[in-house]
C-alpha cells in the first residue's frame, strides 16, 4: 500500500472513533450525570 492510502485510512478511522465516542458520551448511560450550563445560569 502507498503511504497516502495508509494515512487516509488512519485519519478516517480516527475521526470515526472520535465521533463514536462523542455520541456515546452525549447519549450513553453516563449522559444523565452531565450538567447543562444554561440551566445553571438563571436570568
UniProtKB/Swiss-Prot annotation:
Upper lineage: Eukaryota, Cryptophyceae, Pyrenomonadales, Geminigeraceae, Guillardia
UniProt xrefs under InterPro entries: PSII_PsbN
One GO cellular component term noted in the UniProt record for this chain: chloroplast thylakoid membrane
Family assignment from sequence similarity: Belongs to the PsbN family.
The keyword Transmembrane is annotated on this UniProt entry: yes
GO biological process, one term: photosynthesis
Topological category with respect to the lipid bilayer: Single-pass membrane protein
Function: May play a role in photosystem I and II biogenesis.
Transmembrane segments: 7-27
Primary location recorded for the protein, binned into one broad class: plastid
Protein name: Protein PsbN
Swiss-Prot/TrEMBL keywords: Chloroplast, Membrane, Plastid, Thylakoid, Transmembrane, Transmembrane helix
Subcellular location: Plastid, Chloroplast thylakoid membrane
Annotated Pfam families: PsbN
